[in-house]
């Protein structure tokens, strides 16, 4: 097991990374739990891992109850959030009751938002069970639900008490979900570590077959990079925005196609290539870098091109992006592979040229 610590102005917390950690969750997490916990999982993850977690909490003397939600991005909304609140209130959860998010990014985001708002703030713990959530969404305190007009538009910055990433849970992931998570892994190399990007190019076949050692290295490096960035910029006033590489285009894809039609990681993969193409148009990166990024994403079983839809739809969705400031769209681009930048776009013609092959 490896342990990282995330330091933020609000508080510091550990990330536990390793194999076989879920049966140890009670002892590992007990210092970060109250006397009572609410386990929130979805109907897919609960049959796989809920029993193991319940047994671990019983052994640690932590009382608990469970709330089971429908599965999928399409349910990341007010209605499902209210199911969490219903379960908490029906079980008389108090302000010190710890919410435990057992699942992927959708569960983690919703449980975090529920924790941020239930009785004006309850503690929560992340137990991510997908690659995407282990390397990205479980760390850093971004919580949210979707709105029909835009992804993650309603939420809060609210840090967990701890994160426990058991790599064994990745063995039950469908191949498509594993690929989707790999998009975020590749994103880290592209935005800030060319050495890691090159390592991914070398070891992608082993990663896609869940090589234990290589997978642990990749998850640890991603969490390390995110922890370093979050420590410097908890609420995304500056460099934390780099972590949104590909997300402005990607969120537009998810919104246009309907939440869950394209998995988040699939949309981010295509979005990263579009961000590189935009940087090419601005003279900031090379066609060779864009091709190299696309090739690595494709090696992970990911799309490197977006679906086709009207330019006006792209603009409509991107105008709702959370990085928009003073009506000006801000994109995360690349100076080169391994070095991100923040670019303001006032001339939509350059966006049209970037997207032209897909209109």
From Swiss-Prot:
Cellular compartments per GO CC: cytoplasm
Name this polypeptide is given: 3-dehydroquinate synthase
Major location (coarse): cytoplasm
Cofactor note: Binds 1 divalent metal cation per subunit. Can use either Co(2+) or Zn(2+).
GO biological process: amino acid biosynthetic process; aromatic amino acid family biosynthetic process; chorismate biosynthetic process
Residues given in the record as NAD(+) binding sites: 71-76, 105-109, 129-130, 142, 151, 169-172
Molecular function, one GO term: metal ion binding
Pathway: Metabolic intermediate biosynthesis; chorismate biosynthesis; chorismate from D-erythrose 4-phosphate and phosphoenolpyruvate: step 2/7
Reported cofactor(s): NAD(+); Co(2+); Zn(2+)
Keywords on record: Amino-acid biosynthesis, Aromatic amino acid biosynthesis, Cobalt, Cytoplasm, Lyase, Metal-binding, NAD, Nucleotide-binding, Zinc
Pfam families xref list: DHQ_synthase, DHQS_C
SUPFAM superfamilies for this protein: Dehydroquinate synthase-like
Binding site for Zn(2+): 184, 247, 264
Subcellular location: Cytoplasm
InterPro entries: Dehydroquinate_synthase, DHQ_synth_AroB, DHQ_synth_fam, DHQS/DOIS_N, DHQS_C
Function: Catalyzes the conversion of 3-deoxy-D-arabino-heptulosonate 7-phosphate (DAHP) to dehydroquinate (DHQ).
Catalytic activity: 7-phospho-2-dehydro-3-deoxy-D-arabino-heptonate = 3-dehydroquinate + phosphate
PANTHER family, per the entry: 3-DEHYDROQUINATE SYNTHASE, 3-DEHYDROQUINATE SYNTHASE, CHLOROPLASTIC
Organism: Neisseria meningitidis serogroup B (strain ATCC BAA-335 / MC58)
